[in-house]
Amino acid sequence: MAASATTSTLAVTMFGYPNRNCHLKPPATATLRFWRSAAAAAVATSRREAEAEEADEVRRCLAPARLEVLEQMEPWVEAHVLPLLKPAEEAWQPADLVPDAAALGADGFHAACVELRGRAAGVPDAHLVCLVGNMVTEEALPTYQSMANRFESARDVTGADATAWARWIRGWSAEENRHGDVLNRYMYLSGRLDMRQVERTVHRLIGSGMAMHAPASPYHGFIYVAFQERATAISHGNTARNVRAHGDDALARICGAIASDEKRHEAAYTRVVERLLEADPDTTVRALAYMMRRRITMPAALMDDGRDADLFAHYAAAAQQAGTYTASDYRGILEHLIRRWRVAELEAGLSGEGRRARDYVCALPQKIRRMEEKAHDRAAQMRKRPTAIPFSWIFDKPVDLMLP
């Protein structure tokens, strides 16, 4: 009996230890059903917990006392945010940066287009992919205005409100509208892109919308937009430098003009969060920690061209590889905002939860840096070869990418 017991097949418990009270394995199909059921239950529980946590977070930030802070900021927005907008008469327009037949005449317009196409021919495919991704992101402006107009106590209720908050949303949107327009015109004139595929991607992205944590909360919303405006300024600025290095000064001027706008918009939203930290530090720093725990998702994360199921991941890999927008940029933005908002110095008015949120945010850049170093070391050890990924935007030509 002893020998028989020692040679019996032992079943394995869910923690991986042998169960000596059972000498027969359960049927494979039963085991598979158990694990699938357990995994589904765990995912459902996790989702319910996340939804409950977000509901509590939104409820806290939409309390009357919190919204009153935003309402009392109206005169401050009038004095410190609205002046960052440029009137239409002073702002650059797309016709200033791409050939304009009305200004050049038929012959001049034709010559300018030939010159544009000649310069565009020298831009590598990888940089074109990044440019299209940036343009698609800009063209989804209807989604972003809709999201901004969900922020309680800081929205345009009628669509033509005279409040400072409402005028800012409309003015910001008017300036942003030129970005996608000018990039779209350049791409059309360059002749290097499958514009129907680009346009389908824009169409699908606007139709898909975007997901944002705690979307009705102005605290979370302004933090998100401050981060994103800096990210787009960096992306367009890096694109300008990259294409200038390949001889396209006209495209560099376009990207530089867009980056300059984004920096003004970043300044506006950064000021708003700065003011919120002064007026309500506990709620604001907790909102900042909440957003960073869930990471700042990119606004075009749902982009889809109808062919590549992993289009955004491939675009992000191209941007990382080309130096257009990298993981280090993400960390750098966080470090900049922590310094600008003096998060480490926050003390007065913080609850215990607020202090924990402050400490979490201040420690996060170093954690991200360590993750970057580990990822770099793993990549060096694996010595992976690049994968050729076709992009429909450039007529399905492949771009060699280092994928995770």
UniProtKB/Swiss-Prot annotation:
Residues of the transit peptide: 1-39
EC numbers for this chain: 1.14.19.-
Sites where the protein binds Fe cation 2: 176, 229, 262, 265
Textual note on the cofactor: Binds 2 Fe(2+) ions per subunit.
Annotated InterPro entries: Fatty_acid_desaturase-2, Ferritin-like_SF, RNR-like
Biological pathway: Lipid metabolism; fatty acid metabolism
Biological process terms in GO annotation: fatty acid biosynthetic process; fatty acid metabolic process
Keywords: Chloroplast, Fatty acid biosynthesis, Fatty acid metabolism, Iron, Lipid biosynthesis, Lipid metabolism, Metal-binding, Oxidoreductase, Plastid, Transit peptide
GO cellular component: chloroplast
Necessary cofactors: Fe(2+)
Residues that, per the record, bind Fe cation 1: 138, 176, 179, 262
GO molecular function: metal ion binding; stearoyl-[ACP] desaturase activity
Places the protein is found: Plastid, Chloroplast
Record's function text: Introduces a cis double bond in the acyl chain of an acyl-[acyl-carrier protein].
Known partners and oligomeric status: Homodimer.
Family under the similarity heading: Belongs to the fatty acid desaturase type 2 family.
Protein name: Acyl-[acyl-carrier-protein] desaturase 7, chloroplastic
